[in-house]
UniProtKB/Swiss-Prot annotation:
Any one GO cellular component localisation term in the record: nucleus
Organism for this UniProt entry: Mus musculus (Mouse)
Keyword Cell inner membrane applies: no
Compositional bias per record (Pro residues), positions renumbered to this chain: 30-55
First-listed, main subcellular location of the protein, grouped into a coarse class: cytoplasm
Compositionally biased region (Polar residues): 962-975
UniProt feature, compositional bias: Basic residues: 338-353, 1106-1126
Feature: compositional bias, Basic and acidic residues: 987-1005
Protein's UniProt name: NUT family member 1
UniProt PTM comment: Methylated at Gln-1042 by N6AMT1.
Superkingdom of the organism of origin: Eukaryota
Residues modified to Phosphoserine: S973, S1022, S1025, S1027
Location of N5-methylglutamine modifications: Q1042
Similarity field: Belongs to the NUT family.
């Protein structure tokens, strides 16, 4: 050994330190090389060439490592030495190929002495010949392919074999990562070795560490099974022992394997599961290597046909103290492509080698192409021939019994193609049968239905239709009554012929009910709710009182079944199919065309007639530009009455409400003598001819609470006059009249009057007071149960300009031919009925309801030159529809370019106390705003003097502050350019206003009006000159026991700068008593009729002479001054 004490062959994990033990790998000592020069280090390559020629490239050798001390040569060693020559016979068994048999070569190494180096023996103390060359196993292993090496030791005769030490030294087993430079340099020198090319082993250096770790894993796996036989972590523990034992060998090289293994197990137990995952993955790879290696060995045996090669057996360590067998073999198989094998675990795509399967050619063989073409040709041919063979196939199927009648299918197809047949089938099919089929209920009686169907087989079509109608009628009769007590009237009726010859007849709908539906046919159940969505606002109808979206109560009945039957007339494209079903559908809008105007000049049109049940308020159609709120009136339209100066053809609408109250009817225009016609169950709209005065038709109807009894649920509309004789009304609603009156009046007193809108929105409600504009300058009070209102023709109001209407509208073509027709006292039979005259054929919406519950109520209504005032009792007067906004509801045509407006100033100083007077005047305003900014307000005033204060260019509206609780329904009205229309805001009034209070406050009103006139006149004038106004045709309706009141007015409302107008603040106060006097004064050409007849005061009590207005001169002078200033 070297004198410096360093190890001649340190391992890869051992530093070259003096006294370091040698690696336990067995090495074979060869012939001693020549002495090393003193200046040459031990690790330098030796200049001596390799000794034995057996280590040739043709026979690569692989010397396996043995767990035994190194066998070294030399003399004077500390271990036992043997004198004489020793031989080390190395038997090398090479695998040369399938054609050659295995060869065994014996390598005999002679040496003078064999010395064992015991464990821990110092190497530097040895002296003697130079150290021999050692060929380590790592250097030889790199030379592939695998060979089995057996080494045996032999001594001279009589010399015992050396025995292994009792314990093997624990040292790192990882072979040298790099070959010892001396060996490689030696092999490259001289002879054929220097000329050889790099073998596969040289290319396997990169994966050499993984392979050797794999071999150690195989050995440690046997060792781990001895300690952890039942543990499933044997493979992972074996991987863990590789680095741990290496580290222990570095720390303490003299530590034996038995000492290091318990420490390694302790470290394994301390390791966390997460850290163990690395070794589990490594063990998984090694197990894959092992399985693949076994598969390759078996494949090699099969391919080579070498039965002598045994499968790999793991190396078993001998127990300590056992002798090394004479020939210890460790078969090792290294695949030819070692480099590619080591990369296989990373890819995990390597599969066992199998014989290659012939791949399909990339080209489609022509046979397959031809077959495909043949198949497609066959399919296409059969498809083409299908049309030709369909009849034959059908004939075959019919012959097989699929169709018992061959011509049945064709016959059915022919019948189904006829619309008449389909309609007949629908009429013939029993509705109960369809209901049973579609009913989800299981309890059905098919036998009874079968019997009923058998009975119907003998009936013809007419009988079946009649039976269906009767069945529907019975169903309607069985419908549970709603709060309005509506009943169905299924008797078909046809109104009288028109005065133009009666070429067309207007049939009224046969079935009517109380659900919010506008349709021709069966009515829906009254308990359903109708929802009206308009302008982002939604109101729900159904319940004790309608609830508006803003929280205000809407005077709408629970649900109205509106039956609107429209007669085909020239220029009236009215949609007969418009319906409001259930709770959400808005009524379809009518198309807006000039031909759609009702009552065109020169065309005796036939107008919609709403014949309905006596206890239901139906709704009417709406105009096209905007949606309409829930209309709930049944209206009969009479012939048009041309407006003089406007050329407007007005349609009289008749609202038929009540049941069997008395002989009150619809006022029609004609020259026939008055007549009373009683009818059963259903109302009729009768049209008279032009041969006589207005003809009234009486109706036997009875008010229902939904129609006249509920103040919160009934809405009136323009052109409709309601007569509510509350004495004949049996209230069935949860809200009583008095309670409603109190609540409305209390709320009205809390509201402040709001200014008129600059957009001329004439919506009336509890927010603003607006006096309707009187188009006709005649006022005819009518009263008494048996009085007849004869309209007087006088003082036509000329409104120049064209009317632009999108729905049934009015066009200015001619002036009013008859002015101020007076109602004859003989015609009106029952003052509780409703009358309509000179109103546009535009039906209102359920926005607000003004239905007087008193006996004597005076309600002036607008639109026309006729003002009919009937005194009613104000004790039970009530008006509802609080804050019912009517934005966007267009019920009237657009009136534009209106230069002259006559506005009535309604005042009365002799208003009796609420509940005391017999007569009252209820002014209900139905205002409509085209811009959707309608304000709902009700001006309920006592018109003792109705004075039109208007010149040709200015319009002053003096509103009285003595206003009752009445509220009008607000809706949008067509715009009209109102020039110089001034509306004065009145001061709010208090809760209860007596006649004395009114007289005292008139002086205060004067002063306030003067200030208001001076302040707002110029502002309003400037505002109105720039913006278009709205012409609201407001309806003032009331009903009582004394007569029917109607006033035709144009209610003008201008909302400028948002100035509030005083709301009605009076309590339960009626504004007009029975002795009230109505005086109408014409201004600038407004005259009475040619006969000079004064307004008639009709009623049971004599009406006193009208008092002179205190402010007539003042107002006139003020107007003149303003007109001059402009």
């Amino acid at each position: 050994m070297a004198s410096d004490g360093t190890s001649p062959l340190p391992g890869p994990d051992m530093s070259m330190k003096p006294g370091t033990g040698l690696s336990p790998f067995s090495a074979l000592p060869f012939a001693p090389p020549p002495p090393v020069p003193p200046d040459q280090p031990l690790w330098e390559p030796s200049p001596q060439p390799p000794i034995p020629p057996v280590f040739s490239p043709s026979n690569p050798l692989l010397l396996s490592a043995f767990p035994s001390p190194l066998l070294v040569t030399g003399e004077g060693g500390p271990g036992p030495s043997v004198a004489g020559t020793g031989q080390v016979i190395v038997k090398v068994k090479t695998d040369v190929g399938p054609a050659e048999s295995s060869q065994t070569q014996n390598l005999i190494v002679t040496q003078t002495a064999l010395n064992w180096i015991p464990s821990g023996a110092p190497c530097g103390s040895q002296e003697g010949p130079p150290p021999p060359r050692y060929v380590t196993a790592s250097n030889v292993k790199t030379i592939l392919p695998a060979v089995a090496v057996g080494v045996s030791q032999e001594g001279l005769a009589g010399l015992p074999l050396q025995v292994l030490p009792p314990a093997a030294q624990l040292a790192p087993i990882v072979p040298l990562e790099k070959p010892w430079p001396g060996t490689q340099a030696t092999t490259m020198e001289g002879g054929p070795v220097a000329a050889r090319k790099p073998s596969q082993g040289d290319l396997a250096y990169a994966s050499k560490g993984v392979y050797e770790n794999y071999r150690r894993w195989q050995r440690y796996k046997v060792l781990a099974r001895t300690h952890l036989s039942q543990s499933p972590d044997v493979e992972a523990l074996s991987c863990f022992l590789i680095p741990v034992l290496r580290s222990l060998a570095r720390l303490k090289p003299t530590m034996t394997l038995e000492e290091g293994l318990p420490r390694a197990l302790q470290e394994w137990e301390r390791t966390s599961n997460f850290d163990r995952m690395i070794f589990y993955e490594m063990a998984e790879k090694f197990m894959e290597f092992e399985a693949e290696e076994e598969t390759q060995i078996q494949n090699a045996q099969l391919m080579n046909g070498s039965p002598g090669l045994s499968p790999i057996a793991p190396l078993k360590l001998d127990p300590p103290g056992s002798m090394v067998p004479e020939a210890c073999q460790q078969p090792v198989y290294i695949p030819k492509k070692a480099a590619s094998k080591t990369r296989a675990p990373r890819r995990r795509q390597r599969k066992p080698q199998r014989p290659p399967v012939p791949e399909a050619p990339k080209e489609i063989p022509p046979e397959a192409v031809q077959e495909y073409v043949d198949i497609m040709d066959g399919l296409m041919g059969s498809y083409v021939d299908t049309g030709k063979t369909e009849e034959e196939e059908e004939g075959q199927q019919e012959g097989a019994g699929m169709y018992p009648d061959p011509s049945l299918l064709s016959y059915i197809d022919e019948l189904c193609s006829q619309e008449v047949f389909v309609s007949k089938v629908e009429a013939v099919i029993h509705p109960q049968f369809l209901a049973d089929l579609l009913s989800p209920e299981e309890q059905r009686d098919p036998l009874s239905l079968l019997e009923e169907l058998e009975q119907e087989e003998g009936l013809n079509l007419a009988q079946l239709v009649q039976k269906r109608l009767l069945a529907l009628e019975e169903e309607d009769a069985q419908t549970p009554p709603s709060c309005s007590g509506a009943q169905s009237d299924s008797s078909p009726s046809v109104s009288d012929e028109d005065e133009d010859g009666g070429q067309r007849r207007r049939p009224s709908p046969g079935l009517q009910g109380a659900a919010g539906i506008v349709r021709i046919g069966k009515s829906a159940s009254p308990g359903k709710q109708a929802r009206e969505i308009h302008g982002g606002q939604e109101q729900t109808l159904g319940g004790p009182a309608g609830i508006h979206k803003d929280g205000n109560n809407l005077p709408s009945p629970s649900s109205w079944d509106v039956q609107l039957e429209l007669t085909a007339s020239q220029g009236m494209p009215v949609l007969l199919g418009m319906e409001r079903k259930m709770s959400g559908k808005a009524i379809k809008q009518l198309s807006a065309t000039q031909d759609g105007h009702l009552g065109r000049t020169g065309s005796p049109g036939y107008y919609p007639v709403a014949d309905r049940n006596p206890e239901v308020l139906p709704c009417c159609w709406q105009e096209d530009p905007q949606h309409m709120r829930a209309p709930n009136f049944d209206v009969g339209l009479t012939e048009p009455v041309p407006l003089q100066g406007l050329g407007l053809e007005k349609q009289a609408l008749t609202l038929q409400i009540g049941k069997r109250i008395g002989g009150a009817g619809m006022l029609t225009r004609g020259r026939e003598p008055p007549s009373v016609v009683s009818q059963k169950g259903s109302s009729r709209a009768v049209r008279g001819d032009d041969r006589g005065p207005g003809m009234l038709q009486s109706y036997s109807q009875n008010h229902s609470p939904g129609a006249a009894g509920n103040l919160d649920r009934v809405s009136l509309s323009p052109g409709l006059w309601l007569s509510s004789d509350m004495g004949a009304v049996g209230l069935e609603l949860p809200l009583q009249i008095e309670t409603v009156i109190d609540s409305i009046q209390d709320e009205a007193c809390r509201r402040e009057d709001q200014a008129l809108n600059s957009r001329n929105s004439a919506s009336l409600g509890p927010r603003k007071n607006t006096v309707p504009k009187d188009v006709g300058n005649s006022v005819i009070p009518s009263g008494g149960p048996d009085t007849t209102a004869v309209p007087e023709k006088r003082n036509p109001c000329s409104l120049p300009g064209s009317l632009m209407a999108s729905g049934p509208g009015l066009r200015s073509k001619e002036k009013i031919s008859k002015e101020n027709q007076a109602l004859s006292p003989k015609t009106i039979q029952n003052p509780s009925d409703l009358w309509a005259e000179a109103c546009p054929p535009l039906l209102p919406t359920l926005v607000s309801s003004t239905l007087g519950s008193s006996k004597d109520t005076l309600i002036p209504t607008c639109q026309g030159n006729l003002l009919i005032i009937g005194t009613q009792d104000a004790s039970s007067l009530a008006q509802t529809s609080q804050k019912a906004e009517s934005r966007g509801n267009l019920l009237f045509p657009l009136l534009e370019n209106i230069d002259q407006v006559t506005i009535l100033d309604v005042k009365d100083d002799s208003c009796p106390q609420p509940g005391v007077s017999k007569d009252s005047c209820l002014s209900n305003f139905n205002s409509y705003n085209l811009q959707g900014e309608g304000r709902e307000d009700t001006v309920s005033s006592k018109p003792t003097d109705l004075v039109p204060l208007q010149d040709n260019q200015e319009s002053y509206t003096h509103e009285t502050t003595k206003l009752t609780n009445g509220q009008g329904q607000g809706s949008t009205s067509p715009r009209w350019a109102t020039r110089d229309a001034y509306i004065l805001r009145e001061t709010p009034i208090k809760e209860k206003c007596t006649s004395a209070d009114r007289a005292k406050r008139r002086e205060t009103e004067k002063e306030e009006e003067d200030e208001e006139l001076s302040n707002f006149s110029y502002l309003l004038a400037s505002k109105l000159s720039l913006s278009s106004g709205g012409l609201p045709l407001s309806t003032r309706q009331a009903s009582g026991g004394q007569g029917i009141v109607k006033t035709s007015r144009h209610s003008t409302e201008v909302d400028d700068l948002g100035q509030p107008s005083p709301p009605p603040k009076s309590g339960k106060q009626a504004l007009v008593g029975s002795p009230a006097t109505v005086v109408e004064r014409d201004q600038q050409g407004a005259q009475f009729n040619g006969s000079g007849q004064k307004p008639l005061a009709l009623g049971m009590a004599q009406l006193p002479q009208p008092r002179k207005r205190r402010r007539d001169g003042f107002v006139t002078s003020k107007r003149k001054k303003r007109r001059r200033s402009q």
